[in-house]
Structure formats: C-alpha cells, structure tokens
Amino acid sequence: MDSNFIFGIGAFTAIVLVLAVVILIAKSKLVDSGDITISINNDPEKAITLPAGGKLLGALASKGIFVSSACGGGGSCGQCKVKVKSGGGEILPTELSHISKKEAKEGWRLSCQVNVKSSMDVELPEEVFGVKKWECTVISNDNKATFIKELKLAIPEGEEVPFRAGGYIQIEAEPHTVNYKDFDIPEEYHEDWDKFNLWRYVSKVDEHIIRAYSMASYPEEKGIIMLNVRIATPPPRNPDVPPGQMSSYIWSLKPGDKVTISGPFGEFFAKDTDAEMVFIGGGAGMAPMRSHIFDQLKRLHSKRKISFWYGARSKREMFYVEDFDQLQAENDNFTWHVALSDPLPEDNWDGYTGFIHNVLYENYLKNHEAPEDCEYYMCGPPVMNAAVINMLESLGVEHENILLDDFGG
C-alpha cells in the first residue's frame, strides 16, 4: 500500500479526532446539560437541584419560587432583581438599564436574563418565599369605562392571598387567540370602539405569558381579587402595532373561566405615619388608589387627612363614584375630587376641568401651608405621572414623599 495513502488516511483520522474533541469541549462549555444546584440564601434547606438550561427566573419558578416580574421575563421592567454570588456569568447589556454600576459590583442581576448553565449561589428577598400560585375562578368581568374592565376573581375555598393594600399579583395565560369582535361591551361604550374600528383586532399568542396587575381590592375583601384592566389597543396613529397580549386575554374572560395567579408582590405600600395623604390617579391607576383608600378608611379607620384627585376624559370614564361618595359622607377626614379633561356636552359637567396635576395645584396645593410635608401616592398614565412629579418637585416635595405605582396606568 502506498505510504502516502496511509499517511493521508492517518492525517485525516487525526484531524477528525481533534475536531471531535474540540466539539465535545465546546459542547461542555456552551450547551446546558446535566443537573445543577442553586444554593439560596446560604440555607441548605432552600437549595434546589434541576437540569441546566433556561433562565434563572424560570428555574426558580419551576421549583415554586416566584420572583416578581411585571413584564413576564422580558427584561423591560427590572423587577426580578436578585443577587448572584457565583455561577451567573458576566452581566449582559440588556440588564444595564436597570442595574447601576454599584449594584453590578455587588452581584445584582435580572433573573430573567441569567442563563442557568452551572451551579450557582444566589440571594433572594425573604418575602419571595411567601409567594404562592392559585387557580382562581372568574366571578365577573364588567366594563367600568370605555377601555377598562373590572375583573373579579374568586380564590379557592379555604385559601387567602395575604396581600397588603397597594400590592399586585401576576396573572398567567397559555397560548391563545382572542377576537375583539367577540368582546361583550355595553352599548354606552361603543362610540370609541366604532370610531376606531377596534372590533377588527385579533390577539394571537403562541407562548405562555405572565403580566403584573395592581389589585383594586383591599385586604378585608376576603375571598376575592379585583383588578382594573385597561385594554392596550393599538394607537390610532399606528394601527399595525399588535394589541396588548395579556389585556386582550383578560378582556375575553367570562364568568366560570379559570385563571392562574401568583403573589402577593409589592412595594407601593402606605407609610406608617400621621402625615397627610394625597392620592392622585387616572385611568386604570384607580386600582391601587381604591385599595389604599378603602384600607385606610374601612380597615384601619385612619384619622389622617386624606384626599383623592382623579383625572378622566368624561363622565363615561368615571367609576366607583358611589363608593367614594359614601366614603366621603362617612369620613370627615376624606375628600375626593374628579377633573374631566374632555367633558361631553351631555355630561352637563360643572366640576373641575383640565388635567389633574393642574387642578390639584390650582385648587389645593398652591395655597397649602406645607405641601412638602404631605405624602403623595400616585398611579396613572405615564404622562400624568411625569406631570405630577414635576409639579411636586417644584413645590419642594422630597422624592421620599412621592410614591409611584408604575403598573396601573
């Protein structure tokens, strides 16, 4: 046999073997395989073992440890921060908009962005271990305004969600398709739906999704969870944008349907002081406002001075009016005020008009003896939130007295 031929075969075989070794080494480095252990809070009893792969947020959830994630793991909300002491790899560019350089040095990461490739050591907030999942049943799902529904859920009998006023839950949905033409919307709200032909939209979701919603219920309303959900329709100027996935799903729910929630979560809690409380809301930002105000007056029987300032377009967008009227009649320390930015002729409105931050300033804070001493709790559309914050800062209110819920608007 020709020696050159034998040499060629040998060289080819050697190259194949070298390539095979390189591939195996690369696979061991790049491809998740085998079981790994995640040590948690230096507590051996909290450690979990599971197959490598996926993200840390999902890995923890698979073992019943639910870290808050308002965006459902998309990396946009920054809620799912945990401290990764080892095994998490380098911080990713997608995390840097939510994590400061100081936090990064301390090991803080977004758990939805951390790949689970090897064993790791993490530190989680203790309240995470009180979070649970429930399969709830839809009691009702009624329009309260043109684009807002009140979803009322029954918690399984014998269970309770131990939440605080101002807290939120996460709601889950499996892949689904929602046709807007099937929505049950009262005739009084059809004008805008017809004007923009919103009935034509379809929301098709091909994956499991999770979103966060602030609760409108307060802790004494036992056995139920109540949400105010604004449907995220495509903006009129950009009608090709897909409609909101979770809001479309929630709007399609009917009494008797089953819904999975997890919680409770939250940090938008009332301070335990005697300071005056000023609540400012708009749109679906009503939810945490209702929760807080009902809790203060109905459960705690607070004697703090409390006022609520709510902005809406027209009377059609006002809701819970009778509830707040009754609270005002029963509590000398509580007043509430509505400003309509675009009242309809048929509204015959003789109350405040304009944007709520201007109305609050002109009719109350401008002549307040010490606006900087009040506590301000707000939830509404981003434009409203920004306008209110700018107004409060101009009055000398410190950031620690401005509490904002970003979810409800």
Swiss-Prot record:
InterPro entries: 2Fe-2S_ferredoxin-like_sf (IPR036010), 2Fe-2S_ferredoxin-type (IPR001041), Beta-grasp_dom_sf (IPR012675), Cbr1-like_FAD-bd_dom (IPR008333), FAD-bd_FR_type (IPR017927), FNR_nucleotide-bd (IPR039261), NqrF (IPR010205), OxRdtase_FAD/NAD-bd (IPR001433)
Cofactor: [2Fe-2S] cluster; FAD
Biological processes annotated in GO: sodium ion transport
GO CC annotation, single: plasma membrane
Enzyme class: translocase
Segments crossing the lipid bilayer: 5-25
Catalysed reactions, as listed in the record: a ubiquinone + n Na(+)(in) + NADH + H(+) = a ubiquinol + n Na(+)(out) + NAD(+)
UniProt keyword terms in alphabetical order: 2Fe-2S, Cell inner membrane, Cell membrane, FAD, Flavoprotein, Ion transport, Iron, Iron-sulfur, Membrane, Metal-binding, NAD, Sodium, Sodium transport, Translocase, Transmembrane, Transmembrane helix, Transport, Ubiquinone
Cofactor binding description: Binds 1 [2Fe-2S] cluster.
EC code(s) of this entry: 7.2.1.1
GO molecular function, one term: oxidoreductase activity, acting on NAD(P)H, quinone or similar compound as acceptor
Membrane topology listed for this record: Single-pass membrane protein
HAMAP family linked: NqrF (MF_00430)
Protein name, per record: Na(+)-translocating NADH-quinone reductase subunit F
Organism expressing this protein natively: Mannheimia succiniciproducens (strain KCTC 0769BP / MBEL55E)
Lineage, uppermost ranks: Bacteria, Pseudomonadati, Pseudomonadota, Gammaproteobacteria, Pasteurellales
Gene from which this protein is expressed: nqrF
